[in-house]
From Swiss-Prot:
Molecular functions per Gene Ontology: magnesium ion binding; protein homodimerization activity; terpene synthase activity
Organism: Origanum vulgare
Region feature Homodimerization, mapped onto this chain: 320-326, 392-429
One of the GO biological process terms: diterpenoid biosynthetic process
UniProt: Mn(2+) 2 binding residues: 314, 318
Main EC class the enzyme belongs to: lyase
Domain notes from UniProt: The Asp-Asp-Xaa-Xaa-Asp/Glu (DDXXD/E) motif is important for the catalytic activity, presumably through binding to Mg(2+).
Subunit composition and interactions: Homodimer.
SUPFAM superfamilies: Terpenoid cyclases/Protein prenyltransferases, Terpenoid synthases
Function: Involved in the biosynthesis of phenolic sesquiterpenes natural products. Sesquiterpene synthase that catalyzes mainly the formation of (-)-germacrene D and minor amounts of other sesquiterpenes (e.g. bicyclo-germacrene) from farnesyl diphosphate (FPP). Also triggers moderate amounts formation of myrcene, limonene, terpinolene and linalool in the presence of geranyl diphosphate (GPP).
Official protein name in the record: (-)-germacrene D synthase
């Protein structure tokens, strides 16, 4: 989220109005405006023929899964293709059962199978870790020479190196061999990419830019479908089903975004709050990264509205509000009473009433299911968030320079991922999510703190030098007497450790179900996509626009070219 602060001007003077003292920043207008209002029911209708064809092809894929032996290389290759093509959610139980058998046989002698092949060894390891199995990394020791380095003979096996690279991104803290594997595979892939055939070099480049472990399912599927189609050994059944499923789900998402856009247009924030980012489509894309599956439609609607309101609040606290106004807004949100809105200036009242309206909508729907308690947690996390915003605003206006420890204590909250992670569970009605799960996620467990570290540090690294607010880069440089480059190098190391922490938290025994952990993991993946090298949320007219087009505008045709 953007962080813009006042310059050295005092907070107020006798002869200067609040309007003259307001901070300001210029954001580009919405890229999409009312584009998605055109996706009406007749446009996004899924025909009976499409539904029938989907079920027909789905049954064929299931038969293929059932008929392929679990102890074969073909089975793990099939599972990998299904997951990367984006329709693994249809076959979660079958895949889980199959990989369970693979895990049971993991350390058994392989006979004449190609167990020692680097590609297969790495693929099996990755799939099992993705599934949460705590498989040991010593399986890669056989690939080392007498000096403890990876054998030179592996360098020419590009497919093997690529598989090793993907597997090494599932390492956890303390696994030195996985660090070696990542360095070895990535360096040799980068060094030889210009010598590879075009189709292979594209696969390698995509992987180096965004490994599977950090890839958003829908965006990754769109890209992989194109790559998979170019592979001469591709399975035509899988390719056909992937395209059909992608297009059908895209229609569902377009219909959802139509209703979200209509809600947003009704609020008229673009006119009434012109200082704020108008990014509701980008917010929907963000939440699509958290959960894309059709069954999470209600959860997606809830969380999209909450993150959209959070973006507006963020701009009020960081860009526009005076200190007195911000104190009043914070007090009002702590009170959580619609009548308190009368005490706010008009522009804040608009936002405050819309915020309470979103939570009232959620509460009404969850009350019908006897799950109103979930809103107590969600509201409290929003209150905690704005209190952190307020602390940072006080620092900004008083020109207080916090220590790195002081800053991170607030910044891990103000990054909003603690609030969003908790709120992501509210609408997940199909799962047996309990009060215990909400108690766990609001206790700031390691998984959530790691995601918050990734969110905060990646945001701050791209924001330094642009934002006028003191952020982590400034704090670290001041405390350690170092350059921005040295600070960012340290932060990247912290981000890498946080990813490894998240990898480990997803392994059995887990503190929560994978369905819950996946929301936190996916939130980190979105940040990793949008905040590498730039703030592609605040400036969403290029890279982010293309991402959105690929998953929410352009259907997949019979001939699909690279995105």
């Amino acid at each position: 989220m953007a962080e813009i602060c006042a310059s050295a001007a005092p907070i107020s003077t006798k002869n200067t109005s609040v309007e003259e003292l307001r901070r300001s920043v210029t954001y580009h207008p919405s890229v999409w405006r009312d584009h998605f209002l055109s996706y009406t029911n007749d446009v996004t209708e899924i025909t009976a023929a499409e539904k029938e064809e989907l079920e027909k092809q789905k049954e064929k894929v299931k038969n293929l899964l059932d008929q392929t032996p679990n102890d074969s290389t073909l089975k793990i290759e099939l599972i990998d293709a299904i997951q990367r093509l984006g329709f693994g959610y249809h076959f979660e139980e079958v895949i889980d059962e199959s990989l369970g058998e693979v895990y049971d046989r993991y350390e058994m002698p392989s006979g004449k199978d190609d167990e020692d092949e680097i590609r297969v060894r790495s693929l099996r390891f990755r799939l099992l870790r993705q599934q949460g199995y705590r498989v040991p990394c010593d399986v890669f020791e056989k690939l080392l020479d007498d000096k403890g380095n990876f054998k030179d003979s592996l360098i020419t096996d590009v497919e093997g190196l690529l598989s090793l690279y993907e597997a090494s991104n599932y390492g956890i803290n303390g696994e030195e061999i996985m660090d070696k594997a990542l360095k070895f595979s990535s360096s040799h892939l980068e060094g030889s990419i210009h010598k590879m055939p075009t189709s292979l070099s594209r696969r390698v480049k995509e992987a180096l830019d965004m490994p599977i472990s950090k890839t958003l399912t829908r965006l990754g599927a769109r890209k992989f479908i194109s790559l998979y189609q170019e592979d001469e050994s591709h399975n035509e059944l899988l390719l056909k089903f992937a395209k059909l499923d992608f297009n059908i789900v895209q229609k569902m998402h377009q219909r959802e975004l139509h209703h979200i856009t209509r809600w947003w247009e009704g609020l008229e924030f673009g006119k009434k709050l012109p200082f704020a980012r108008d990014r509701v489509v980008e917010c929907f894309f963000w939440i699509l990264g958290v959960y894309f599956e059709p069954k999470y439609e209600i959860a997606r609607r809830f969380l999209t509205k909450v993150i959209s309101m959070t973006s507006i609040l963020d701009d009020i606290y960081d860009v526009y509000g005076s200190l007195d106004e911000l104190r009043r807004l914070t007090h009002a949100i702590q009170r959580w009473d619609i009548s308190v809105g009368d005490e706010l200036p008009p522009y804040m009242r608009i936002c405050y009433e819309a915020l309470l309206g979103v939570y009232s909508e959620m509460e009404d729907e969850m009350a019908k299911k006897g799950q109103s308690y979930r809103l107590l947690y969600a509201r409290q996390e929003m209150i905690k968030l704005v209190m952190a915003y307020m602390v940072e605003a006080e620092w900004c206006f008083s020109k207080y320079f916090p220590t790195m420890e002081e800053y991170m204590k607030q910044a891990l909250v103000s990054g909003a991922y603690m609030m969003l992670s908790t709120t992501s569970l509210v609408g997940m009605e199909d799962l047996n999510i309990t009060k215990h799960d909400f108690d766990w996620i609001t206790s700031e467990p390691p998984m959530l703190r790691a995601a918050s570290v990734i969110c905060r540090l990646m945001d701050d690294m791209v924001g330094h030098g642009i934002e006028q607010k003191i952020i982590s880069v400034d704090c670290y440089m001041r405390e350690n007497g170092c350059s921005k480059e040295e600070a960012c190098r340290e932060f990247w190391n912290r981000v890498k450790k946080a990813w490894k922490c998240m990898n480990e938290e997803c392994l059995e025994p887990r503190a929560a179900s994978m369905a819950i952990l996946a929301r936190v993991l996916n939130l980190a993946r979105v940040i990793n996509l949008l905040y590498v090298g730039e703030d592609a949320y605040g400036s969403s007219s290029t890279k982010t626009k293309n991402f959105i087009k690929s998953v929410l505008v352009d259907p997949i045709h019979s001939i699909e070219y690279h995105i």
